[in-house]
């Protein structure tokens, strides 16, 4: 199941995994906290800043909200077009929702362009990301080409509603990312625990050697009558 879920990951998950692996779990010796710059500022490049933005969970949540909002716009427009919400509605109302949907799609187009610029070939390594981009581009083209058609949603309403699948992909991507982060931290904690156990065993050995040395020195002192035996 985990192998299937990994196909739903978004671009940038590999970058986040590397970042998590670089986190040090310091228990033996603590260091003074350092003032580290924000990842967006520390990227030192526009492409790096875009990678951080597209990989952040807050951005994924914004995308989920926009996808749901866009689907609601489309659903309302379909219902208005089929005259299910009201028998008579102003002709301008469906157009308003249509343009609202186009505005959200325009943001998705910019998102795809930004991902292509930031991740380049890595973008095409995620099949569902490519499929998602194809759905958005096709929906955007259809909306623009048939912008004056009143019966557009009778034919392509379901196609546009397919964008709802992005919610499942993004949510699954977040789940897989959190799971991977937890597994990596557990692995590092286990390694750190083994290291600490080795240090404890080494310290116990040193203590035993010191106790033996103390006994030897006490015996030597007693032999030279430095102090009487207890």
Swiss-Prot record:
Q: Could you list the residue ranges forming a coiled coil in this record?
A: 177-226
Cytoplasmic side, ranges:
1-58, 120-127, 177-230
| Cellular component, GO, one term | monoatomic ion channel complex
Record-level Gene Ontology MF annotations? voltage-gated proton channel activity
What membrane topology term does the record carry?
Multi-pass membrane protein
Matching entries from Pfam families are given as: Ion_trans
Which keywords, in A-to-Z order, does the entry hold?
Cell membrane, Coiled coil, Ion channel, Ion transport, Membrane, Transmembrane, Transmembrane helix, Transport, Voltage-gated channel
> What domain of life?
Eukaryota
InterPro entries the record matches: Hvcn1, Ion_trans_dom, Volt_channel_dom_sf
All ranges on the Extracellular side of the membrane:
80-96, 149-155
A GO BP entry is: cellular response to pH
Membrane-crossing ranges are 59-79, 97-119, 128-148, 156-176
Q: Which locations, inside or outside the cell, does it occupy? A: Membrane; Cell membrane
Q: Regarding domains, what does the record say?
A: The segment S4 is probably the voltage-sensor and is characterized by a series of positively charged amino acids at every third position. Unlike other voltage-gated ion channels it lacks the pore domain.
Q: What does this protein do?
A: Mediates the voltage-dependent proton permeability of excitable membranes. Forms a proton-selective channel through which protons may pass in accordance with their electrochemical gradient.
Similarity comment: Belongs to the hydrogen channel family.
Q: How does it assemble?
A: Homodimer.
Q: What is this protein called?
A: Voltage-gated hydrogen channel 1
């Amino acid at each position: 199941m985990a192998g299937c879920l990994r196909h739903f990951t978004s671009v940038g998950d590999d970058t986040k995994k590397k970042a998590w692996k670089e986190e040090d779990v310091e228990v033996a010796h603590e260091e003074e906290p350092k003032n580290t710059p924000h990842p967006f500022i520390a990227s030192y490049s526009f492409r790096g800043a875009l990678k951080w933005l597209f990989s952040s969970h807050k951005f994924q949540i914004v995308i989920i909200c926009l996808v749901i909002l866009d689907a609601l716009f489309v659903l309302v427009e379909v219902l208005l077009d089929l005259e299910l919400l009201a028998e008579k509605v102003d002709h301008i109302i469906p157009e308003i929702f249509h343009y609202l949907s186009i505005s959200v799609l325009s943001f998705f187009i910019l998102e795809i362009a930004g991902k292509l610029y930031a991740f380049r070939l890595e973008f095409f390594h995620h099949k569902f990301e490519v499929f998602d981009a194809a759905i958005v581009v096709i929906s955007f083209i259809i909306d623009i080409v048939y912008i004056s058609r009143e019966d557009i949603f009778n034919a392509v309403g379901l196609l546009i509603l397919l964008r709802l699948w992005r919610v499942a992909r993004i949510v699954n991507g977040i789940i897989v990312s959190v799971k991977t982060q937890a597994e990596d931290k557990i692995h590092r904690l286990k390694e750190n625990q083994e290291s600490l156990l080795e240090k404890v065993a080494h310290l116990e050995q040193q203590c035993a050697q010191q106790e033996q040395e103390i006994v030897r020195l006490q015996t030597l002192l007693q032999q030279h009558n430095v102090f009487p035996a207890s």
